[in-house]
Amino acid sequence: MTNPLLTPFSLPPFSAIKPEHVVPAVTKALKDCRAAVESAVAHGAPYSWENLCQPLAEVDDVLGRIFSPVSHLNSVKNSPELREAYEQTLPLLSEYSTWVGQHEGLYKAYRDLRDGDNYATLNTAQKKAVDNALRDFELSGIGLPPEAQKRYGEIAARLSELGNQYSNNVLDATMGWNKLVTDVADLAGMPESALAAAQAQAQAKEQEGYLLTLDIPSYLPVMTYCDNQALREEMYRAYSTRASDQGPNAGKWDNSPVMAEILALRHELAQLLGFDSYAYKSLATKMAKDPQQVLDFLTDLAKRARPQGEKELAQLRAFAKAEFGVDELQPWDIAYYSEKQKQHLYSISDEQLRPYFPENKAVSGLFEVVKRIYGITAKERTDVDVWHPEVRFFELYDEHNELRGSFYLDLYAREHKRGGAWMDDCVGQMRKLDGSLQKPVAYLTCNFNRPVNGKPALFTHDEVITLFHEFGHGLHHMLTRIDTAGVSGISGVPWDAVELPSQFMENWCWEPEALAFISGHYETGEPLPQELLEKMLAAKNYQAAMFILRQLEFGLFDFRLHAEYKPEQGAKILETLAEIKKQVAVVPGPTWGRFPHAFSHIFAGGYAAGYYSYLWADVLAADAFSRFEEEGIFNRETGQSFLDNILSRGGSEEPMELFKRFRGREPQLDAMLEHYGIKG
């Protein structure tokens, strides 16, 4: 039987990939990678791009193209068999990556290229790729004695395993709780769309009634709209104690020991490499200079936002008391009364807006924005093999009708699909040895409500923002003009700059001129009426300071957890969180809350000692967008400048340089505070 993963393909053959194909394909690809490394090194000096970097980029690309669909399926179509196969490949990949990072001969070959005459003949992107490779050798412990190198490899392998275990615990804990409500009176206040979804969930399980789960499209409407306080509390407890030692499934999928070991190993790894803490190691590949700069940035922002956050909460408490006679707001009351207050102040709710954002309008509106700013057109293809019938596939063409890249769009929440929204690369742009150009392909994944009862999928405005955000990442990947592996698209972009294109794209969701075609009632097609539009814009910064403070809580918690770790004390996870809450949070959290246990961003994603990146990039994005506000939000020349200077440059140059080229100066904090309506 042939292995579809080992048969060359331009797009992954999703319907043919079976769990039993995974390990043999990855093993074979790794064997080829090792052979290519040995053969390139054996070539001997003088080394050049052609005899060293290019051949390795090509085998690496094959490995990536085999592993990418596997890892993607593990996220969007998880099954016990696939999970097992995926887990078997993790140690193999980790071991290979350590082997490469500590390959003395390969390191010498790169140093020879860096110090030899050939370096001068490389273009900017190639030089950056070589410099990054040398930096990564240092960060893989190339200079360490053999014992320490061995320990580095053990730690890296164990961390990869632990991250996966953490992620599985969160997924299992999320899927491990649900509640069937048989009396609709218990769901009073819930919008029609949420009831229909809960009913469909129950029917899918052949049950009568309404099935509630901890997936966001099910959880949020209960917290926001359900009049039943006991049910809100029950769901809040289940959600905020997922994968922990507390709550309805206490101890069942507990991430406490996983986090403790992750933090201990990260610290040991950082120290092995000569860093004071993992925070220093994290910043070795980021835009921010040192931990102090990050802490100052976060603390300064907290100082500016805190007074307004306190005011927002005080107003909410006063409102709940005056209108509903509520003496004490519990954590599971905040979203509920906030929605009521928002209605009261602006007479607008997410649900009122939903009919104006049917999927087809939101998606075609997004494409229209991209066409106006960058001259890029999206065309759908229906002949592509996908992992689920609901997945769509599009190609992007520029004004010269050149294919620039393509992407899969997977919008709805499903069982066995991890929550959240993300962009991932399927194929990276790369110039091949034979001169051909491999075009980029992306995955865009969201978890929105699916169409029910013959209506199209109707999005909330927040979901439209999420769609624009992920598409911003997608454009960064697909519109790259760099064809050097390792620095094209999002590759090699420092983590605190990678959110710039995504947060930047969100701005158009608030522009009346853009909303005119992003919105359209699913029955009549009429765009958002002026009156609703004005209310929506007025409500834009409702509780903005509370939102920023929540992000600061996450950012400071993550950063201080890594920066202040002391081996003799171990991980002070809940203590650190409590301290930071005192400093920045205005909404008190219950002592049994276990937010860290499901904070996948930092324990199973790429955001360790890096969650601050969201706010850091927010500053860049707001400042970049302010140039559009000055020159016109659909100014094609401004759009071209952003495309030429930032989007298309990938990781080929330092982000600060690219930003200054577009903006003419360094970023300033003011635009961001203004965007959030914070008088700092």
Model-derived features: where do they sit?
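Acidic/His-rich structured neighborhood in mature extracellular/periplasmic domains
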Residues: 98, 442, 465
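C-terminal, non-catalytic "cap/extension" segments appended to globular domains
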Residues: 1-24, 28, 189, 197, ...
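Short His/Asp/Glu-rich catalytic/ion-coordination signatures at enzyme active sites or charged loops
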Residues: 7-21, 70-89, 112-154, 213-257, ...
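Short pre-active-site segment immediately N-terminal to the catalytic Zn-binding motif
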Residues: 449-467
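N-terminal helix-rich structural modules
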Residues: 1-190, 628
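Active-site-proximal, well-structured secondary-structure segments within enzyme catalytic domains
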Residues: 125, 129, 158-161, 168-213, ...
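Aromatic/His-enriched, Gly/Pro-containing loop or helix-boundary segments
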Residues: 78, 122, 133-137, 250-251, ...
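Short, glycine-/Ser/Thr-/acidic-enriched flexible segments
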Residues: 217-219, 269, 399-401, 411-414, ...
